Amino acid sequence: MPAIVIVGAQWGDEGKGKATDLLGGRVDYVVKPNGGNNAGHTVVVGGEKYELKLLPAGILSPNAVPIIGNGCVVNLEALFQEIDGLEARGADTSKLRVSANAHLVAPYHQVLDKVTERFLGSRAIGTTGRGIGPAYMDKVARLGIRVQDVFDASILRQKVEGSLRQKNELLVKVYNRRDIEVDEIVDYFLSFAERLRPLVIDSTYVLNTALDEGKVVLMEGGQATFLDVDHGTYPFVTSSNPTAGGASVGSGIGPTRISRSIGIIKAYTTRVGAGPFPTELFDEMGMYLQKTGGEFGVNTGRPRRCGWYDAVLARHASRVNGFTDYFVTKLDVLTGIEQIPVCVAYDVDGVRHDEMPMTQTEFHHAKPIFEYFEGWTEDITGARTLEDLPENAKNYVLALEKLSGTRFSAIGVGPDRDQTIVVNDLIND
């Protein structure tokens, strides 16, 4: 069987965890190809809410093998805290595996992340302070420490020494902080070696062998399209490529083996942290969406900025990722709103743009051009087919599908796994 990739189509928090959980019972492997414990996601199973950060949502699917891929950066302390938290609630994490080539987040990465944000002041990106950006910087600069290095104390020490030679200069001379001892970091990593060893695999070999054997592999991207370091609203982005192409690189699965690229998109739009957001609401309606949708970050608790659905973004995300399907979430949050605006184009300094503006400056100047749709008041959480939806809700969904340029194959009408309208099978159709 070919592989399937799930990608956030906005700025994150679209409900990728729900989509993964819905499909998890039908797949054999769920791999997280990018990011670290900076991207939280919520999964509701049997009325119980689980807030995951570093672990793939597939950890809660009893039949799937969850894998942290080579494209991730792993905070070992956070990893085992999350595992322990799930096991304390009765979840089975014994199938979890971690790529030997994944990079590690060191304590000094977290220190650098926080002091850099403070140093930038009003120009801060709004990171989670988890050290993800600095860890990816070290990866690209060839100063990174990988999972496999924890099992060779000599190599580990050499790499820590090389990295700290640069980091301590920065910490002491620029940020007026104390230097960090090599032994402190080496001992920190070695303390996890025994527990980590049984989890570590050659993930590229395992996943491709599984595909050769006809198994189904689901790649669960973190963050989202417009946080991608290449395709997002740079510089207000993450440090990896949470797009479909990045999922291929971060899992070691070649692009020709991917059969479905599924975009996860909210029926409205949210964003955490700084950066442009054309449809953002600054009034009571924005507060209403925030409260009704529970729009607060899993990782930081920060309130999410809320706005209307942006079809320009949806079309661009579909183009970048080659989406075959969209999975729309949180349609139920819009229940009770009398009239629902949808952004169909932008006004940039008096010029209409039907597609994403080319430059950062233009996007910062973009003002939404809206079309308006009649709302509904009926409870839709029990709907399981399009025909079950009130006429106005159905019209809204069909309009978004047409404006977004990609078929809507699933629609979330509530937080639970079964509160979903499946229009087209997301694996076999």
UniProtKB/Swiss-Prot annotation:
GO terms for biological process: 'de novo' AMP biosynthetic process; IMP metabolic process. SMART domains: Adenylsucc_synt. Substrate binds at residues 298-304. One of its GO terms (cellular component) is cytoplasm. IMP binds at residues 13-16, 38-41, 128, 142, 223, 238, 302. CDD domains: AdSS. It comes from the Bacteria. Its cofactor is Mg(2+). InterPro entries: Adenylosuccin_syn_GTP-bd, Adenylosuccin_syn_Lys_AS, Adenylosuccinate_synth_dom1, Adenylosuccinate_synth_dom2, Adenylosuccinate_synth_dom3, Adenylosuccinate_synthetase, P-loop_NTPase. Mg(2+) binds at residues 13, 40. GO terms for molecular function: adenylosuccinate synthase activity; GTP binding; magnesium ion binding. Gene3D superfamilies: Adenylosuccinate Synthetase, subunit A, domain 1, Adenylosuccinate Synthetase, subunit A, domain 2, Adenylosuccinate Synthetase, subunit A, domain 3. It holds the Pfam family Adenylsucc_synt. NCBIfam families: PRK01117.1 (NF002223), purA (TIGR00184). Homodimer. This is Adenylosuccinate synthetase. It comes from Arthrobacter sp. (strain FB24). The lineage of its organism: Bacteria, Bacillati, Actinomycetota, Actinomycetes, Micrococcales. The gene is purA.
